[in-house]
């Protein structure tokens, strides 16, 4: 069996898939307002229901933002499909209007390096009810939307591009405390990488493709539920394991997802109580991209 820092690693792969993302910079006058907007806009991962998921890639200093204020890079993702642009427009509009615009002093700027863009006048600016106007500020073409607090400013053209979603690792732990410590350290370490998000941070409920109740969406991966060990004949939970979290990673290209997966593996392997590392493998039923853990260890360790 493979090992990393003395922790066994399954010789397996994760299944990732193509997705469409938009990367934006959110700024605000105060840190607490920025956090409220960034977390609101990226909350509730729901691509499995034909909607969107997101995450905060990193926090920015005033020296790193277009308007010289505190900021955050956020990513919003939708599934790649024939009508992805319709879904992206709907979901970006919803998350910006209801997650960011309603938070005082916020502004939104494009951070996607892409030739493909959508017009934010259509799905955000028009909530100004025709009283919004176009301007040029900070060297960018923006829409200024009058609101009761003052105004909301958004860059008019927001980019989108194709990336890789669903990269993941699982880590098997002797306790919930070890699982939380390892997961928090891994998610924090990824803030040092450009281009990746963890839409669930520490995901407590890994799922499986098949289900008894399709109307519910993804169901619990019962094979790996510690509380079912001894209750079902096909449990795959090792002796002594009490928690098996998952960290799901989306990135702007495959290389950054691979690097992020290895960083997570390396970080969690150094935490006491982590006894095994694996990944979500569904025999090709979920994603078209296979990222082998063995290859990551050989490439990055």
Curated annotation (Swiss-Prot):
GO molecular-function terms, A-Z: formylmethanofuran-tetrahydromethanopterin N-formyltransferase activity
Pfam families listed in its UniProt record: FTR, FTR_C
Entry's Gene Ontology BP terms: one-carbon metabolic process
Keyword tags: Transferase
Coiled coil segments of this chain: none
Family listed:
Belongs to the FTR family.
Report the protein name in the record.
Answer: Formylmethanofuran--tetrahydromethanopterin formyltransferase-like protein
What species does this protein belong to? Archaeoglobus fulgidus (strain ATCC 49558 / DSM 4304 / JCM 9628 / NBRC 100126 / VC-16)
């Amino acid at each position: 069996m493979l090992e990393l820092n003395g922790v066994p690693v399954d010789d397996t792969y994760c299944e990732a898939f193509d997705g469409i993302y938009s990367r934006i910079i959110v700024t605000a006058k105060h840190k607490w307002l920025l956090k409220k907007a960034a977390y609101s806009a990226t909350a509730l991962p729901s691509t499995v229901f034909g909607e969107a998921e997101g995450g905060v890639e990193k926090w920015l200093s005033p020296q790193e933002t277009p308007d010289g204020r505190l900021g955050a890079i956020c990513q919003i993702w939708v599934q790649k499909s024939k009508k992805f642009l319709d879904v992206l427009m709907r979901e970006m509009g919803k998350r910006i209007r209801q997650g960011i615009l309603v938070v005082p002093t916020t502004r939104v700027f494009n951070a996607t390096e892409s030739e493909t863009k959508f017009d934010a006048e259509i799905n955000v600016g028009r909530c100004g009810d025709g009283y919004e106007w176009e301007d040029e500020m900070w060297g960018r073409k923006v829409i200024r939307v009058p609101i009761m607090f003052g105004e909301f400013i958004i860059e008019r053209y927001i980019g989108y591009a194709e990336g890789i979603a669903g990269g993941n690792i699982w880590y098997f732990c002797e306790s919930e405390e070890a699982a939380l410590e390892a997961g928090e350290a891994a998610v924090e370490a990824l803030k040092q990488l450009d281009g990746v998000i963890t839409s669930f941070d520490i995901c407590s409920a890994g799922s499986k493709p098949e289900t008894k109740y399709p109307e519910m969406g993804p169901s619990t991966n019962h094979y790996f539920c510690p509380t079912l060990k001894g209750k079902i004949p096909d449990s795959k939970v090792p002796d002594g394991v009490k928690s098996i979290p998952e960290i799901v990673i989306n990135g702007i290209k495959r290389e950054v997802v691979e690097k992020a997966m290895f960083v997570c593996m390396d970080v969690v392997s150094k935490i006491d109580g982590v006894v095994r590392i694996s990944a979500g493998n569904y025999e090709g039923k979920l994603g078209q991209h296979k990222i082998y853990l063995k290859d990551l260890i050989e490439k990055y360790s």
